[in-house]
């Protein structure tokens, strides 16, 4: 969702992973720090039919953004949005308001929102609104990676019936790589009725 896109073997980290894994890439730089690009990254097996980048910046806080990608899979229009919300409650509320039009759009049959919400309270404003728009999101503990007690990272799926399983991956390597555990969500789109 958020990546420091430094050079790796003659290309950006994003492109390196996309090439190594045979994936398609959608990326958005939100800001630069010490000459490095920072931003959002979405890698996918399927080729998106459309991608868009959305500015979720708030006041003088660290710039934030979202990647939106539309796919056609098994005859369904699928929208995937990946983002990373800010640290303050006010910032997260504003970012949610900026993102809502893309989540409330009923053109896609299916919607998936993957995010580090920086929000651990299940009854927070952000999660209450998202439950109303997309339905419930299973909570898996992802932060801090060394002793995960908070569910900062979530995957919302609408309809939820397409979500087969969801888990946080907790290995020694993962814990060294990030302060958050990655979330793996498995979807079954073939069984969804139009």
How would you describe each model-predicted region?
Residues 1-3:
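A short beta-strand-loop structural module common to alpha/beta enzyme folds
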Residues 7-9, 15, 19-194:
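Active-site regions of metal-assisted phosphoester/phosphodiester hydrolases
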């Amino acid at each position: 969702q958020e990546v420091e896109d430094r050079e790796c073997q003659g290309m950006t980290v994003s492109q390196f992973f996309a090439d190594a894994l045979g994936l398609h890439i959608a990326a958005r730089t939100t800001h630069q720090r010490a000459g490095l690009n920072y931003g959002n990254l979405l890698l996918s097996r399927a080729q998106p039919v459309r991608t868009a980048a959305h500015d979720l910046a708030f006041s003088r806080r660290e710039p934030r953004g979202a990647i939106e990608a539309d796919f056609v899979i098994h005859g369904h229009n699928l929208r995937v949005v990946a983002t990373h919300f800010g640290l303050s409650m006010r910032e997260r509320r504003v970012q949610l308001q900026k993102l809502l039009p893309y989540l409330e759009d009923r053109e896609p049959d299916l919607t998936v929102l993957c995010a580090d919400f920086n929000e651990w309270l299940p009854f927070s404003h952000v999660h209450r609104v998202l439950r109303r728009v997309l339905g419930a999101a299973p909570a898996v503990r992802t932060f801090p990676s060394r002793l995960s007690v908070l569910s900062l990272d979530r995957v919302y799926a609408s309809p939820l019936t397409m979500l087969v399983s969801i888990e946080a991956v907790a290995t020694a390597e993962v814990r060294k790589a990030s302060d958050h555990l990655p979330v793996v969500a498995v979807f079954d789109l073939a069984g969804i009725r139009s």
